[in-house]
Structure formats: C-alpha cells, structure tokens
C-alpha cells in the first residue's frame, strides 16, 4: 500500500490523519493505511452524528429544510429525498448501520416508500425512478439490509425495467415527457427501445456493486460494459 504514495508530489496522509474530523482520521487509518482501529461504533458517538439524529422525526425521516415551490412540494416527496441524503451521510461518513436503532427507523421510513412493484416512489411523484430507487437501495445494503427480501424485490424491479440494450434510463424521459407534466401524470411507461442513459445506469450500478450476489450478475456486467463504452466519447 505504500508504493502509491511515492508517486505523488505531496503525501496526503499526514493531513488526513491530523484532520479535526475524527471520521476522516479513522477511515484513513483503516482503509488506506490498513491499521487496526477501534470498533466502528466509536464514530457513532461523535457529536456530528448526534446532532444529525436530533433532527430525526418520529416516523424516522428528516424534514427537508428548504422552502421550495409549494406546487412542486405537494407532488414530490421532499422528506424522502432529505432522508436519503442524510442516510448517505451517516452511512458513508460515520459507518452507521442497522445495529443503530435510529438507522433502523430511517430504513423503515424509506421502505414505507417502496411499492408493491419493488421501486421506491415519490421523489418523482407517481413516476418510476430507477436512479433514486437504486441509490436508496445502495445505502440500505451498506447499512446491513443486503439479505432483506425487500432489497431482493427492488433488484427484481430494476432488472424488469432495463432498456432493451441492457442499461437504464428515467422512464418518462424516454417518451420526451416534460418534468413538470410528468409530476402531474399517471405512471408513464418507458419506451424500452430508446438507448440507455449513462448517468442513470451509473447510479443503478452502485446498488449492484454494493450487493454480494448481484455485483457479479451477468446483467451488471453487461451494464458495466455499456457504461464503459461511453467513456472518452
């Protein structure tokens, strides 16, 4: 692990391990220096994380802090969006998982937004959202829900809504629907013959990459090849 540091004009490690943010120091020692560190739960007691938890609502969500436009807020699930964002911060920055009761509450809130089809819906009103569905799934997997049947259901939905080329796109975009119009419409089915979106496919693949079984699936490999084909165009 040390050889790569010799290739750099400036060694970043001293700055990282002397950072005031204890989480940065922790993961630098653990993931970069391969040092033995204290249990991850030590990060859960940091004041930064506790401050975030103080804003959690009774239903497990976090309230969106902005004002927004009222006619859009009535159609978009802003609290789901904010809870997704906050969960990402807690999981990725502080290593929290479902051993913590407040993470379980947040997960329960997000799972309450999962439909019978398997997608997580509401951020685009009634419309399908492979990107947000997969992004939420990625965080839930990292939080310890990889073996949960609701995650399996989500993957089955993602596989069912692929474009014919093997990638993903936002369904209402494939029929050229305007965003504001889509928010007020019934579910818009995708035109699967349209080409995949490299942006959406990249987000969806993050959920596959986080899952022990699905990361090696032929569908993930195919989508990865498609995504790689868009590099340096």
Where are these regions (language model features)?
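Preference for long, amphipathic alpha-helical scaffolds in soluble/luminal domains
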Residues: 1-233
């Amino acid at each position: 692990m040390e050889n790569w540091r010799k290739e750099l004009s400036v060694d970043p490690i001293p700055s990282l391990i002397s950072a005031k943010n204890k989480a940065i120091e922790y993961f630098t020692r653990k993931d970069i220096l391969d040092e033995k560190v204290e249990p991850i739960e030590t990060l859960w007691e940091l004041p930064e994380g506790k401050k975030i938890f103080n804003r959690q609502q009774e239903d497990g969500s976090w309230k969106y802090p902005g004002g927004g436009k009222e006619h859009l807020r009535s159609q978009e699930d802003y609290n789901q969006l904010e809870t997704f964002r906050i969960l990402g911060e807690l999981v990725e920055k502080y290593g929290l998982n479902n051993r913590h009761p407040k993470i379980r509450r947040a997960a329960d809130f997000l799972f309450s937004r999962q439909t019978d089809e398997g997608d997580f819906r509401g951020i685009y009103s009634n419309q399908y959202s492979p990107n947000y569905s997969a992004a939420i799934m990625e965080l839930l997997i990292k939080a310890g829900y990889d073996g949960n049947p609701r995650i399996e259901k989500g993957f089955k939905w993602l596989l069912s809504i692929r474009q014919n080329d093997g990638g993903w796109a936002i369904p209402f975009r494939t029929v050229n629907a305007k965003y504001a119009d889509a928010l007020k419409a019934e579910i818009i089915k995708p035109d699967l013959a349209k080409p995949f979106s490299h942006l959406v496919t990249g987000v969806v693949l993050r959920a596959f990459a986080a899952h022990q079984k699905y990361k090696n699936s032929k569908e993930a490999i195919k989508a990865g090849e498609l995504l790689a084909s868009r590099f340096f165009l």
